[in-house]
Swiss-Prot record:
Entry domain remark: The FHA and BRCT domains specifically recognize and bind phosphorylated proteins.
Motif (Nuclear localization signal): 461-467
Residues bearing PTM Phosphoserine: 278, 343, 347, 397, 432, 509, 518, 615, 673
Name of the protein in question: Nibrin
Subunit structure: Component of the MRN complex composed of two heterodimers RAD50 and MRE11 associated with a single NBN. The MRN complexes dimerize on DNA to form joined MRN-MRN oligomers required for DNA double-strand break repair. The MRN complexes dimerize on DNA to form joined MRN-MRN oligomers required for DNA double-strand break repair. As part of the MRN complex, interacts with MCM9; the interaction recruits the complex to DNA repair sites. Component of the BASC complex, at least composed of BRCA1, MSH2, MSH6, MLH1, ATM, BLM, RAD50, MRE11 and NBN.
Amino acid sequence: MWKLLPAAGPAGGEPYRLLTGVEYVVGRKNCAILIEKDQSISRNHAVLTANFSVTNLSQTDEIPVLALKDNSKYGTFVNEEKMQNGFSRTLKSGDSITFGVFESKFRIEYEPLVACSSCLDVSGKTALNQAILQLGGFTVNNWTEECTHLVMVSVKVTIKTICALICGRPIVKPEYFTEFLKAVQSKKQLPQIESFYPPLDEPSIGSKNVDLSGRQERKQIFKGKTFIFLNAKQHKKLSSAVVFGGGEARLITEENEEEHNFFLAPGTCVVDTGITNSQTLIPDCQKKWIQSIMDMLQRQGLRPIPEAEIGLAVIFMTTKNYCDPQGHPSTGLKTTTPGPSLSQGLSVDEKLMPSAPVNTTTYVADTESEQADTWDLSERPKEIKVSKMEQKFRMLSQDAPTVKESCKTSSNNNSMVSNTLAKMRIPNYQLSPTKLPSINKSKDRASQQQQTNSIRNYFQPSTKKRERDEENQEMSSCKSARIEMSCSLLEQTQPAIPLLWKNKEQHLSENEPVDTNSDNNLFTDTDLISTVKNSASKSHAAEKLRSNKKREMHDVTIEDEVLEQLLKDTKPELEIEVKVQKQEEDVNIRKRPRMDVETNDTFSDKAVPESSKISQENEIGKKHELKEESLWSTKEISNNDKLQDHSEMLPKKLLLTEFRSLVIKNSTSRNPSGINGDYGLLKNFKKFKKVTYPGAGKLPHIIGGSDLIAHHARKNTELEEWLRQEMEVQNQHAKEESLADDLFRYNPYLKRRR
């Protein structure tokens, strides 16, 4: 870009940077280039303009043309030669300019600006080209010695990066030129280039301290070394970097083959062609020739130099560990064939540094809990400690298929039950203390289900239920497992029995023998006594039963089919319940009217005293009939007082089952007083009121008094005003026309004869 440097006189100070496409006026007042304290300077003394003469910005040999035009009174001098007023002149770098006749002297210089972009996307390249164009520079794709900057978003080791480091050129971000352009336009201080260095994006060398600034040591890094390339593509790609570093690059093929001593000379580095790489396409005959050279080097104790070591030697500024045929290869970094460049048009590999070294050791992700054992990931892989919990999960995953197979193949019901119980006992983990209350709750719930089952046994099964097709039909494996589990729950969760109940149990067992040797007997005498006591206490716990009825219905429905099957299987062994059930039927008949009254009270809030009296009379009549049928009911009533003392020990959360008929028994229970059928003394029961409207009490009018509203009164006045103004305007025009006609009349006044 062009710069106007003050040489002497009152125009001293910072240089003026000239952007392309902008006219810079040199003058005394209100100018871009202001020269004060010089009386020979005009207000618009001269104009400087820089423009490109070619459209191709890649032509680095063409620089922008800077033209100077003189508009002054006292003249402008270029190299002590006065310019003609009103004419332009092309300037060259190094020309001296004197404005006026005094000491306002300047010098013109051109500062080269050639930016080479690498690894930029399309939008980044477009923004870079626009900024470089305004600054008067060029953008190129391939690195040359004329390049002044390497533009990268993040530093990746490519051929361009190596060449820029060897040449000592700065590597900057694209934002540097954007900020530079803004600073020139606003005449502010230029940005510091150190703050626009891109970060290093090479995982293999990211942890090491790397100096990517311009160092003089890199310019002679390969001095005294000769790099032998056995492949034309490698030579074309890497020869420029070797030459920039002071070395010599030679291409050796089968046609111009040298002697073996040439490859063994000191300072000679044979570049590895990477024939083991599948991406490198080399003919078989050439592979044999290359392999013979590699075998010769190996016999002499030498090694080929990988491509990556050329870049590493430049980055770390040493050839002791890199590019040494007699030394050992570097163990810190793996050297593989690099990937292709993003900016070169040729299909050659540009990137020298590999990605992160691939380790074949597989590491397991840390997905365990905090209590689980942890492990460290270091340079050398260690054994991974697996927690006990994870081992148990693995044991369970192995045992699960065997359990499923046993469930499918077994046909015996006992084996099916054992398998299902085995599935429940598979988790052998130690339970935490927070889970123990839930287990206790499950036990209490099981005991409540057992008590509920005993109450359900109190009622006979309804005859409306569907009968089984076959009495001795084999049960399915799932149902047998459920029966076995329910039996185990009943046996394990039976509640404690009071002493009073135990005495009565012994009394009943002496009077009525029971078959206790049967295997399927699930309901003992204790259950029968508890059902009798529970039935006696139903009237006292009716309110609590209603509140818990909905909650228990969900738990009881699960056991319906199991209980129904058990009732059929245990029919011969439960003959003792026949007598008790007959007595309980009488009690049920006696209590049903009372329960009906209570349920009617809960559902209807507006109960009438007359309906309650009728229900009480029916209840008293039924009680007299029941007294004559059995004596056990009266004994039970006398025992209610004793049972009230033990009401605390009675089971709670029981299920109340009622058998209701769909026929309305008490038709007089409806409230006749709630409906008043006599409308004789009442007025019209309609609550709305007719709204009066204009003309409601008169004859209908098509157009009536208040319906007429002067809607267009305002519009008429405006129209009249407009018409009046128009008439005045027309009259005025008529008067003007008549006056004009009178001016041109020869004899406006006519004389009439008398």
